[in-house]
Design a protein with these regions (language model features):
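Hydrophobic alpha-helical transmembrane segments that constitute the membrane-spanning cores
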Residues: 31, 96-121, 141, 145, ...
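Aromatic- and glycine-rich beta-strand/loop motifs that create alpha-glucan
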Residues: 1-25
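Membrane-interfacial helix-loop-helix connectors in multipass membrane proteins
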Residues: 39-51, 115-136, 182-195
């Protein structure tokens, strides 16, 4: 367990060297939400409020896709991935640490800030809290799914489009359940089944992703 947290701490130190790049996802979200609000300012306020959760979810999904390439890229460039394969016994543990640190640095800030933005833009606090819960479950799931695509395409120089093609269809269930839960909360309908389905998907990929990534990295680096 100590080695796991040591690996996460190492990832944080490496990410801190990138400076403002860590803040880019939050800046993207802020810009998207501002432009969204300006572009439909002529629409009825109630309609805008109903659309806010969907817009947040779509923004988070696209930002997650943009960040996927960075999960293994630096380790691939400096040769650390070769050490992962040599130290095969702990490869899955190292991969999980890398995915978790990527999520904490890239997607967790979005999950925290997005509901605050929706409250500022007029969404009620209860619905914003449900939005936060769905993002807290959905964004790590997207990182787990995306890590598989990133591992499969790591040896390709321009892999962003290919990664997007692979992961976007797999993100659809998360998007459906996430937006449905928030929408149900807005209209005071039970959203428990949607949250349960999101948790099940998360647990499935929490088990599958480390194994799939290790196999994909071995194939890509062969």
């Amino acid at each position: 367990m100590n080695n796991f947290f040591n690996n996460i701490n190492k990832e944080f130190i490496m990410a801190s060297r990138s400076g403002l790049e860590v803040l880019m996802p939050v800046m993207y979200l802020f810009i998207i939400m501002v432009f969204f609000n300006i572009s439909i300012s002529y629409v009825d306020k109630n309609i805008i409020t109903e659309l806010l959760p969907l817009m947040v979810w779509m923004s988070c999904l696209l930002i997650c896709v943009l960040n996927l390439e960075t999960i293994f890229r630096e380790d691939y460039d400096d040769g650390t991935l070769d050490m992962f394969i040599i130290n095969d016994r702990h490869m899955e543990r190292d991969i999980i640490a890398k995915i978790m640190s990527h999520w904490i640095l890239s997607n967790l800030p979005i999950a925290i800030i997005a509901p605050i933005l929706t409250i500022i833009l007029g969404l009620d606090t209860d619905t914003s809290f449900v939005l936060f819960i769905t993002l807290l479950i959905g964004t790590p799931t997207m990182s787990l799914i995306g890590s598989i695509a990133a591992a499969l395409t790591i040896s390709l120089k321009k892999n962003k489009i290919l990664v997007s093609i692979i992961v976007l269809p797999m993100y659809i269930p998360i998007l459906i359940f996430g937006t449905s839960a928030v929408n149900n909360s807005y209209f005071n309908i039970s959203y428990n089944s949607e949250l349960i389905m999101m948790i099940i998907i998360f647990l499935i990929f929490l088990l599958v992703s480390p194994i799939a990534c290790s196999k994909a990295l071995k194939i890509s680096l062969d």
